[in-house]
Regions:
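Active-site-adjacent structural segments surrounding the nucleophilic cysteine of cysteine proteases
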Residues: 12, 22-97, 146, 160, ...
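Hydrophobic membrane-insertion alpha-helices, especially the h-region
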Residues: 16-20
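Short solvent-exposed strand/turn elements
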Residues: 164-182
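Bacterial N-terminal signal peptides that target proteins for export
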Residues: 2-15
Length: 222
């Protein structure tokens, strides 16, 4: 006589468990949706700027080592800022936007864009952050290694079949991250994130401030 009562007593627990399971499955499906940002690829080896000296480097050019500024240029173009790697490089050189001759000071992006795009973070290879940024339609600059050398690409989306999608400045193409650099949990060394917003006080008389240079050179440039 007590057995039916036991079953009745368990029903709320079973129903609650079923609801929780359905919610978990729904969250997983939502997290697996595809996100892509259409950004035209650019090549650091384009003849229009490839031969230009990178910053004040005695040896490097935009073509040989301008991957970071080319990745940033593609991002800036996405935000409707009319520029290209050659123009960006010239401005950085004239306005103290490089540390140690040719290493991009990421804060300089804020000054260059007049505050329309602000550098917001130098982070580790956090795929959760990457997905959140892409879901918010904000491309992410990622540090990788190409033939043992430091390289930067622009993360523009992710798909169910191919994983992360990138614009690669060295090759000037759009390609799957996995196809070129392997597992992103290993292949991505660090990321740079950016927001659309107001200036952060990094301009002094039209130049990147010395304080920003000193801090960025020590903390943000390699």
């Amino acid at each position: 006589m007590k057995f039916p009562r036991l079953i009745v007593g368990l029903r709320p627990v079973i129903v609650a468990a079923a609801i929780a399971l359905m919610a978990a499955l729904s969250n997983q499906l939502g997290a697996s949706a595809e996100t892509t940002i259409e950004i035209a690829p650019a090549s650091q080896q384009n003849g229009a700027w490839a031969g230009a000296r990178l910053g004040t480097s005695p040896t490097e050019t935009v073509g040989s080592a301008g991957c970071a500024i080319t990745a940033v240029t593609m991002m800036l173009q996405y935000y409707d800022i009319n520029t290209d790697p050659g123009t960006f490089n010239a401005w950085l050189t004239a306005n103290g936007g490089y540390a140690f001759d040719d290493m991009l000071i990421w804060n300089a992006v804020t000054a260059y864009s007049g505050g329309r795009v602000t550098f917001s973070g130098w982070l580790g290879p956090d795929l959760g952050v990457i997905e959140a940024e892409l879901d918010a339609a904000r491309p992410v600059v990622a540090e990788v290694q190409l033939n043992g050398n430091q390289h930067f690409v622009l993360l523009t989306g992710y798909t169910l079949s191919g994983g992360l999608v990138i614009n690669d400045p060295w090759f000037g193409d759009v390609v799957s991250f996995n196809a070129r650099y392997g597992d992103p949990t290993i292949g991505i060394l660090s990321i740079r994130t950016f927001l659309v917003g107001e200036p952060a006080g990094l301009r002094v008389d039209g130049r990147v401030s010395w304080l920003a240079n000193a801090i960025s050179a020590a903390q943000l440039a390699r």
